[in-house]
From Swiss-Prot:
Any one Gene Ontology BP term: tRNA wobble uridine modification
Gene name tied to this protein: mnmG
Keyword vocabulary terms for this entry: Cytoplasm, FAD, Flavoprotein, NAD, tRNA processing
Binding site for NAD(+): 277-291
Top-level taxon of the source organism: Bacteria
Record organism: Thermotoga sp. (strain RQ2)
Ligand binding (FAD): G15, A16, G17, H18, A19, G20
Quaternary state and interactors: Homodimer. Heterotetramer of two MnmE and two MnmG subunits.
Task performed by this protein: NAD-binding protein involved in the addition of a carboxymethylaminomethyl (cmnm) group at the wobble position (U34) of certain tRNAs, forming tRNA-cmnm(5)s(2)U34.
Subcellular compartments: Cytoplasm
Official protein name in the record: tRNA uridine 5-carboxymethylaminomethyl modification enzyme MnmG
InterPro entries: FAD/NAD-bd_sf (IPR036188), GIDA_C_N (IPR049312), MnmG (IPR004416), MnmG-rel (IPR002218), MnmG-rel_CS (IPR020595), MnmG_C (IPR026904), MnmG_C_subdom (IPR047001), MnmG_C_subdom_sf (IPR044920)
A GO MF term: flavin adenine dinucleotide binding
Length: 626
């Protein structure tokens, strides 16, 4: 018998990608002993596709993870080499940060953070079997036959479940390029009753810096404004040493792709790929086939880090044979002499139907077994990390005997993501978009900590000083808004000349600074000339401007949320006998039995359930309460 401390843990995390890291750190920081098993401990938090974190919706998720006490934002700040705020010219609801990271440094930093946490053991091992006893998880067994016992298990296997790589008609098993797949764990999950599907994704080739002609490409430098993902970090301006570059495909590129389509594992005469690929991150052959009228597509040439000369060709993801790849790449302006260091490839992998999970990400089939990340049918590092921290927090809360953390759609993009997964399921790799969030004006990049720090503090992942800093910010925002309402500006030649010069109409009667700030042409800084006591706090000013200018829209959304909350708070007993509910359609009855929504609100979002089904369900539940 092995020593107990080598065999028995509180929480076992399977996989050390972006989901596994956040799950492990959350559970460990909440006081539990955590074992992290991974195929390769040297590729912790690896970025196998684009060397970037953030983007529309995704960047907000990174801020939400930070507000809950996670690590992705801090490590991005530590290792980023180029960062920009996207959609600056648009409204605050769609603004988000995106950073190029030094992917090698990011991975090493995350590995160090796992290894230096006294509650975490990071160990090599490919998990092959989930151990259960009386419907509850008991532990895992790895490829060496070594068993580990745990009170909770979190599966974060990414693309490793029966992973298979495709380059043209060449195919071989792999979790990602150069790493073994997990070939047997899927069988164990199927034996436990899980429904499993197959998805595919892909990554472009990497090319050597010295072979790129940057002089004919459009340069994209890091921001001149100080920026940071984490609220803990001081925003800073990065040196302009690692720009990204923009070029485009052309008719010759598309001609080469069409010429080799018959050798594509997706489009070719021999169809090798069964899995469905990501709609919002299509391969270049997908784009050429589906958008025949487009003469060119963007290609972003992105640095992979400080200590590597490899560049990532964002926009040229493909599974065509290498002969096609080199010709296609060299047809692109600036890449005529490109030296390929790694070929592009597609990878097919297993995922579980996420409708088999509760909103806590615990499975409905096996108690204390959680799933997070790409194994749930999502795509993207940020989506994975967001699920990871929720799974880690909820596993720890359950072991503590405390209520779970379930973020609402009106509270966080992470809430939207998980609700979509467990309610609607997936028929393609799921990517978060701003359009998926009906309350996106409330779920902004700038207010993530105001929304969520209370939960991070409640579960013990946010220190008291930080939470007090957030509360102080909230208080100062409210105080400044109230002050602006009290400062009255009277019409005068000086005032009206200033307003006219700023492109807005002159005053005919006295108004408050609050009312003036509502005008789209006027910023807080522009009103300083009319304000006896303006504040000089950029964080407060940003929040004040947004809250004042968008007050009508924000208020309308809060009213919608109030209606939403009414149905969200109308709980449905988990053991409800849906066969006893009269007048339900057959489709509604089947779906309600399968998903077992926790509330009327969640039931309303299940595809195929119509308003009359909901009415009949409410009538039945109301009668049961009487």
């Amino acid at each position: 018998m092995r020593p107990e401390d080598d065999r028995v843990y509180d929480v076992i995390v399977v996989g050390a990608g972006h989901a596994g890291i956040e799950a492990a750190l959350a559970a460990a920081r909440m006081g539990f002993r955590v074992l992290v098993l991974t195929v390769n401990p040297d590729t912790v938090g690896w970025a196998p596709c684009n060397p970037a974190i953030g983007g529309p919706a995704k960047g907000v998720v990174v801020r939400e993870i930070d507000a809950l006490g996670g690590e992705m934002a801090k490590t991005t700040d530590e290792t980023m080499i180029n960062v920009r705020m996207l959609n600056v010219s648009k409204g605050p609801a769609v603004r988000a940060l995106r950073a190029q990271i030094d992917k090698i440094s990011y991975s090493r930093t995350m590995k160090r953070k796992l290894e230096t946490n006294p509650n975490i053991v990071l160990r090599h091992g490919i998990v092959e079997r989930i151990l259960t006893e009386k419907g509850r998880v008991k532990g895992v067994v790895d490829n060496y036959g070594i068993d580990y016992l745990g009170k909770a298990v979190i599966v974060t296997t990414g693309t490793f479940l029966r992973g298979k790589i495709f380059i043209g008609r060449s195919t071989f098993p792999a979790g990602r390029m150069g790493e073994f797949p997990a070939t047997k764990l899927t069988e164990s999950l199927i034996e436990l009753g899980f429904e499993v599907g197959r998805f595919k994704t892909g990554t472009p080739a990497r090319v050597l810096k010295r072979s790129i002609n940057f002089s004919v490409m459009e340069r994209q430098d890091t921001s001149d404004e100080p920026l940071a993902f984490s609220f803990f970090d001081e925003p800073r301006v990065l040196p302009k040493d690692y720009p990204c570059w923009l070029t485009r495909t052309n008719p010759e590129t598309h001609s080469i792709i069409k010429q080799y389509l018959e050798f594509s594992p997706l489009y070719g005469t021999v169809k090798l790929i069964e899995g469905i690929g990501p709609r919002y991150c299509p391969s270049i052959e997908d784009k050429v086939v589906k958008f025949k009228d487009k003469e060119s597509h963007q290609v972003f040439v992105e640095p992979e880090g400080r200590d590597t000369e490899e560049y990532y060709l964002n926009g040229l993801s493909t599974s065509l044979p290498y002969e096609a790849q080199i010709k296609m790449i060299r047809s692109v302006k600036g890449l005529e002499n490109a030296i390929v260091t790694r070929p592009a490839y597609a990878i097919e992998y297993d995922y579980i139907d996420p409708r088999q999970l509760y909103p806590t990400l615990e499975s409905k089939l096996v108690e204390n077994l959680y799933f997070a990340g790409q194994v749930n049918g999502t795509s993207g590092y940020e989506e994975a990390a967001g699920q990871g921290i929720i799974a880690g927090i909820n596993a720890a809360l359950k072991l503590r005997g405390e209520p779970p953390l379930i973020l609402k759609r009106s509270e966080a993009y992470i809430g939207v993501l998980i609700d979509d997964l467990v309610t609607k399921g997936v028929d393609e790799p799921y990517r978060l978009l701003t359009s998926r969030a009906e309350y996106r004006l409330l779920l902004r990049h700038d207010n993530a900590h105001l929304r969520l720090a209370k939960y991070g503090y409640r579960v013990g992942l946010i220190p008291k000083w930080f939470y007090e800093k957030v509360l102080s910010l909230e208080r100062r925002i409210n105080e400044e808004i109230e002050r602006l309402k009290k400062v009255i500006v009277k019409p005068s030649d000086r005032v009206n000349d200033l307003l006219t010069s700023l492109g807005t109409s002159p005053l005919k009667e006295s108004v408050s600074l609050y009312q003036l700030l509502k005008r789209p042409q006027l910023s807080y800084s522009a009103l300083k000339f009319l304000d006896p006591n303006p504040i000089d706090d950029p964080e407060v000013v940003e929040q004040v401007e947004i809250n004042v200018k968008y007050e009508g829209y924000i208020q309308k959304m809060f009213e919608e949320v109030a209606v939403f909350e009414k149905y969200e708070n109308y709980e449905i007993p988990h053991d409800l006998d849906y066969d006893a509910v009269p007048n339900l359609s057959t489709e509604a009855r089947d779906k309600l039995k399968k998903i077992r929504p926790r509330s009327i609100g969640q039931a309303m979002r299940i595809p195929g359930i119509n308003p009359s089904d909901i009415s009949n369900l409410i009538i039945y539940l109301d009668r049961k309460k009487q």
